[in-house]
């Protein structure tokens, strides 16, 4: 039977690290308890209160839809915002971010109708709105829980909901202000229309997907000419019943061509070869046609008893088609523009659900998509079809129904983008905003320069009603300042639902009459405001509307919001306040799976931030992942990336654990001066000070991935690999009150305090846990980032540079000895350095500690066995067997007698109490 190993009699004399800070984080189980503590102690409110006299920093939160739980894209957005708020707080700002929720609109209404099933048909507007309100409130609650679980700080009693009575009243107020200033008008013009949902769509509600359309070349006969036609190309045969003109470009040359099978055809010279290639017909030029020739022509509709006139517009190009553009003013923006300028009616023979009306009698009631092949066949029968094929192209679809949209002229309310020079003023203002990344300014400028007037009205139930009325006698729309202001006062007192619960006479000022026929019998209109208008006026509801009102410091959303919320917020603010609602705009990319694919249920690659990450790994792991990403581009997430981040977290946590095991907050009260510290400690405080300055600047510029890399590198290389190894001997074996140990312990305390603060915006739970274990009484979020200017000393860089260069060579020589099987631990070696003694201004004892060996010599004489030799930049390095014995307490080979303590350890142990 083997004898039990004898316990080292000196083991209890060594000052090993001691801490209750657990190695295993167990984040998923322990974070909820900390969330409760933060709530109970009102940490978020207190951290704002103690900085109430400081400069403010306001991040205005873009409201997500109150529909479904937060997905991983939401977690990226919300955690980024929280990191910013916390880093600005620790930078000394009074910070604010009031979270908001977008509660109206199609996503919620469609889902509620789906939940109602057959009962939807029997559900009136008021009851439907009530259910929508309940549905939205439910998901505001669920998403609020998600926000808490992301470890985000927010005041649950201070949030904004677009369906809140005061917010709805504010929406109507802003609408009224814009109306009074002349920005709001009603007109019949083509807008994006969803025939499946029977409502208009704004540009921000459009998704582009591939779509297969018919591609047809059609000939329109020239009136009064024999076998002469104008050749047009279209991918929307269903719009041909609305054709009223053919548009040309005055800058393009046109000619009359002889075809082999379709008579004489008019088209642009620059598209002759393309037409021949697409259609297979052969064209021979007969003569050129001037603009005057084209202007005097009249064209005959191919299957209706109607004439089409020639028009001219610069939207006609040589990109595709024939250069002769089929023009239906009721079904296209360019068509509408040139058509109305020429006095053409806005013909749109299609109803809300995409069915032909009696304005196209022969196909009345047929849906447009079903009509496409019928119209193609009709053209073939009329000998007007030159060529048919199918064409795959990017086509606008509804963001909600996912079905193709059409352009359809309907009476709608619009926000005039060019009224009072608004577009030009907005472009000037955009140039004064900081856009991050900087390509953001190019993107939004191009959108603002080209966007049409904003269609504000929607033909749905769940939203804020546009307070317009219609005369029952003559059909005139009634809306004026007096009506709006009267309605606003009612809404403030009774809420927006009065629109659906009361009669028109109860909502109108007394004695209101139709300005056309004098009738007092008016009814409420049914249109509601675009939900993008709701969120677009959120800055008014949250911050006020005075001219010159200080804008928010930052808007932070996905890059798709250049055409969404960034614009919908810009227009009302510029029109009313004369300034943008933001000083800076920061965007992030989409979250993709690890292969770079978009997440979708059909692909089975959706990652749920709560169930897949937080409940398994903890929110701090998700937050750390966010900090690792250069979020300005699209980012990837998956099991491998979370595993990598978890490993990095473990290294950071172990660094904290070592620090906590060797020091405490009480150590900071020593307030040691620079001259009281050893050189190596001063050097690492200098490195800490540089890190501190760099990280603070990186937080200010939102480069969190660089914050992560800088701090991780400092923890794993500067501390764990170098500094902790260098001071291990003095921390474990020097006397507790020795100058050397106190110097290093104080340095560790400073490092711990500073690192806790620097990582607090990212690892909120872990740093709070560290802060408490350190012995701090208040939250880490009540503190500010440290000012370490006193520890900066560039002279230490030059002093220590040759030491670390030599250490690299020593490490290579030690590794060579290990490969030869002659060395185990580095303390079993002594180092002989031949050369460069003058460049290493430290004693042999100090260098031995730096290199973690037992001895360092500068003379090559001696009889000890040479383990290995290395010739490097610092000269020749020999690794030799030490001539002294191993100390049984510190394990260094510095003892004069085998089995006995070295001089230092003997002095320390002799002074210890026998108890």
From Swiss-Prot:
Binds 1 zinc ion per subunit. One of its GO terms (biological process) is isoleucyl-tRNA aminoacylation. ATP binds at residue 601. InterPro entries: aa-tRNA-synth_I_CS (IPR001412), aa-tRNA-synth_Ia (IPR002300), Anticodon_Ile_BEm (IPR033708), Ile-tRNA-ligase (IPR002301), Ile-tRNA-ligase_type1 (IPR023585), Ile-tRNA_ligase (IPR050081), M/V/L/I-tRNA-synth_anticd-bd (IPR013155), Rossmann-like_a/b/a_fold (IPR014729). Zn(2+) binds at residues 887, 890, 902, 905. L-isoleucyl-5'-AMP binds at residue 557. IleRS has two distinct active sites: one for aminoacylation and one for editing. The misactivated valine is translocated from the active site to the editing site, which sterically excludes the correctly activated isoleucine. The single editing site contains two valyl binding pockets, one specific for each substrate (Val-AMP or Val-tRNA(Ile)). This is Isoleucine--tRNA ligase. The gene is ileS.
């Amino acid at each position: 039977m083997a004898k039990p190993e004898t316990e080292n009699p000196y083991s209890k004399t060594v000052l090993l690290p001691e801490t209750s800070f657990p190695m295993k984080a167990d984040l998923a189980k322990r974070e909820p308890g900390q969330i409760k503590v933060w709530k109970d102690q009102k940490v978020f409110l207190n951290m704002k209160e103690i900085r109430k006299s400081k400069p403010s920093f306001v991040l205005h939160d873009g409201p997500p839809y109150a529909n479904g739980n937060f997905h991983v894209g939401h977690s990226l957005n919300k955690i980024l915002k929280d990191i910013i708020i916390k880093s600005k707080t620790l930078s000394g700002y009074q910070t604010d971010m009031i979270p908001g929720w977008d509660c109206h609109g199609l996503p919620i209404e469609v889902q509620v109708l789906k939940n109602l099933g057959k009962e939807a048909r029997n559900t009136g507007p008021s009851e439907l709105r009530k259910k929508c309100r309940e549905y939205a409130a439910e998901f505001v609650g669920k998403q609020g829980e998600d926000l808490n679980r992301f470890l985000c700080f927010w005041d649950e009693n201070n949030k904004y909901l677009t369906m809140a009575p005061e917010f709805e009243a504010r929406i109507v107020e802003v609408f009224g202000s814009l109306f009074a200033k002349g920005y709001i008008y009603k007109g019949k013009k083509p807008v994006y229309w969803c025939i499946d949902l029977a409502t208009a769509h704004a540009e921000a509600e459009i998704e582009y997907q591939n779509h297969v359309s018919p591609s047809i070349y059609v000939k329109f006969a020239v009136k009064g000419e024999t076998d002469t036609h104008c050749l047009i190309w279209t991918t929307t045969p269903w719009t041909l019943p609305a054709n009223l003109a053919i548009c040309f470009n005055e800058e393009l040359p046109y000619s009359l061509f002889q075809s082999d099978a379709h008579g004489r055809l008019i088209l642009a010279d620059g598209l002759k070869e393309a037409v021949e290639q697409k259609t297979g017909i052969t064209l021979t030029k007969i003569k050129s046609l001037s603009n005057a020739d084209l202007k005097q022509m009249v064209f005959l509709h191919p299957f209706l008893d109607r004439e089409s006139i020639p028009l001219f517009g610069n939207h006609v190009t040589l990109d595709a088609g024939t250069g002769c553009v089929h023009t239906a003013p009721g079904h296209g923006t360019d068509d509408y523009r040139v058509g109305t300028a020429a006095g053409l009616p806005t013909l749109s023979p299609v109803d809300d659900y995409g069915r032909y009306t009696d304005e196209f009698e022969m196909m009345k009631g047929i849906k447009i998509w079903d009509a496409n092949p019928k119209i193609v066949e009709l053209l073939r029968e009329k000998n007007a079809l030159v060529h048919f094929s199918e064409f795959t192209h990017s086509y606008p679809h509804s963001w909600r129904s996912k079905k193709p949209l059409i352009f359809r002229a309907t009476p709608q309310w619009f926000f005039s983008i060019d009224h009072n020079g608004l577009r030009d003023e907005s472009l000037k203002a955009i140039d004064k905003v900081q856009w991050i990344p900087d390509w953001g300014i190019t993107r939004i400028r191009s959108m603002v320069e080209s966007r049409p007037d904003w269609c504000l009205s929607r033909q749905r139930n769940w939203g804020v009603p546009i307070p317009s009325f219609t005369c029952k006698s003559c059909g005139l729309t009634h809306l004026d300042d007096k009506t709006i202001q009267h309605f606003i006062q009612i809404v403030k007192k009774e809420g927006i639902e009065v629109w659906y619960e009361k009669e028109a006479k109860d909502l109108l000022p007394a004695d209101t009459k139709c300005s056309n026929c004098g009738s007092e019998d008016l009814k409420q209109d049914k249109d509601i405001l675009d939900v993008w208008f709701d969120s677009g006026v959120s800055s008014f509801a949250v911050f006020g509307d005075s001219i010159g009102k200080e804008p928010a410091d930052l808007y932070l959303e996905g890059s798709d919001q250049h055409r969404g919320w960034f614009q919908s917020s810009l227009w009302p603010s510029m029109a009313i306040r004369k300034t943008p609602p933001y000083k800076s705009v920061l965007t992030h990319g989409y979250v993709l799976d690890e292969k770079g694919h978009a997440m979708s249920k059909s692909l089975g690659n959706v990652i749920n931030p709560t169930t897949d990450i937080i409940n398994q790994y903890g929110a701090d792991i998700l937050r750390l992942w966010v900090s690792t990403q250069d979020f300005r581009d699209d980012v990837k997430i998956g099991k491998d990336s979370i595993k990598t981040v978890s490993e990095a977290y473990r290294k950071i946590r172990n660094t904290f654990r070592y620090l906590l095991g060797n020091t405490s907050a009480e150590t900071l009260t020593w307030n040691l001066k620079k001259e009281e510290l050893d050189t190596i400690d001063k050097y690492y405080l200098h490195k800490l000070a540089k890190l501190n300055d760099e990280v603070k600047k990186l937080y200010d510029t939102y480069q969190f991935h660089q914050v992560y890399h800088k701090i991780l590198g400092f923890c794993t290389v500067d501390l764990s690999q170098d500094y902790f190894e260098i001071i291990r001997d003095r921390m474990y074996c020097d006397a507790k009150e020795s100058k050397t140990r106190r110097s290093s312990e104080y340095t560790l305390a400073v490092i711990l305090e500073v690192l806790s603060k620097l990582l607090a915006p990212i690892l909120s739970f872990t740093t709070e846990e560290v802060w408490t274990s350190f012995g701090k009484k208040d939250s880490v979020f009540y503190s500010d980032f440290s000012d370490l200017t006193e520890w900066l000393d560039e002279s230490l860089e030059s002093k220590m540079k040759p030491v670390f260069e030599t250490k690299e060579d020593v490490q290579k020589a030690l590794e060579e000895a290990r490969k030869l099987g002659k060395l185990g631990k580095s303390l079993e070696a002594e180092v002989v350095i031949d050369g460069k003694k003058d460049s290493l201004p430290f004693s042999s004892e100090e260098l031995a500690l730096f290199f973690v060996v037992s001895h360092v010599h500068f003379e090559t004489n001696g009889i000890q066995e040479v383990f290995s030799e290395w010739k490097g930049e610092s000269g020749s390095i020999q690794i030799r067997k030490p001539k002294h014995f191993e100390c049984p307490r510190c394990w260094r080979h510095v003892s004069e007698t085998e089995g006995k303590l070295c001089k230092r350890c003997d002095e320390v142990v002799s002074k210890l109490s026998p108890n």
